[in-house]
Amino acid sequence: MLHPATQQSPFMVDLHDQVHQGPVPLSYTVTTVTTQGFPLPASQHIPGCSAQQLPACSVMFSGQHYPLCCLPPPLIQACTMQQLPVPYHTYPHLISSDHYILHPPPPAPPPQPTHMAPLGQFVSLQTQHPRMPLQRLDNEMDLRGDQHPLGSFTYSTSATGPTLSPSVPLHYLPHDPLHQELSFGVPYSHMMPRRLSTQRYRLQQPLPPPPPPPPPSYYPSFLPYFLSMLPMSPTTVGPTISLDLDVDDVEMENYEALLNLAERLGDAKPRGLTKADIEQLPSYRFNPDSHQSEQTLCVVCFSDFEVRQLLRVLPCNHEFHAKCVDKWLKANRTCPICRADASEVPREAE
């Protein structure tokens, strides 16, 4: 029984599947396994490998690992296993429907001659791990020749298989599903419908309501001015209204504003004339023969003067019906025609 050395160097072995139509190169990954020995028949002799301890290696077909042989790096050229014929009908379950195919690396050196017996005479295959999709390697296999689909697998009609440079080490990849890709370059194809549905669900969500409008701004200079126009001061309103106002400053400001307004408006006068002021205005009976004014109608009622009608004369010498102009002067202090003050001339005459 062979015992592996303490220092193990991982490497890759190329297996070709023999079918009636030609050899079938399978996509596989060689990984190092736990230290163990493999019984070999006494009748089989491996040149250059019988006197040394060999590290263990394994072959993975479609996610399944199989122990194969023990070969140290110094004896790779003496004991090469690039082409090992395997009957196609012996392992039909290995040709699965996995869509994960390795991509080819740069070209390798020319093939070396085979120095070992067929695989079926001394290799015992056993399953170590459940099947899982192959993962992409940095050092990948070079598949050459005419490619023909066989079910969901791919085989070549060329007789010569690819070779592997002994100086390129291979590493065991952990089963990390984050780096799996399909053969046609679409990552996570089984997650795409769910991802699209999630985006559609996000698009269908209603938008949040708009924020409420801000409250109306407060103008502090308008309220004191409005309260100052009231007959009572803000301090006498009551305890329910508390205003942080400087009363002295507010009163001074309002007093100056009122003085400016009084200068522009002048002295305050009543709106109309009293009954006594109206009766002091001169009046007479209309006589067309003795009438000296050119005015023949009342502007208030737009009626012509008639005989024996009572007319009232304003200080501006405009004449009107007494009833019409008296009603007008109770609400206005000016003449309806020239807007002259009706109370100034009689007081000067007095």
From Swiss-Prot:
Keywords, alphabetical: Metal-binding, Zinc, Zinc-finger
Annotated InterPro entries: Znf_RING (IPR001841), Znf_RING/FYVE/PHD (IPR013083)
ZnF (RING-type) intervals: 298-339
Gene Ontology MF annotations: ubiquitin protein ligase activity; zinc ion binding
One BP annotation, GO: protein ubiquitination
Family annotation (PANTHER family): GH10160P (PTHR46171), RING FINGER PROTEIN 44 (PTHR46171:SF2)
Record's protein name: RING finger protein 44
Originating species: Rattus norvegicus
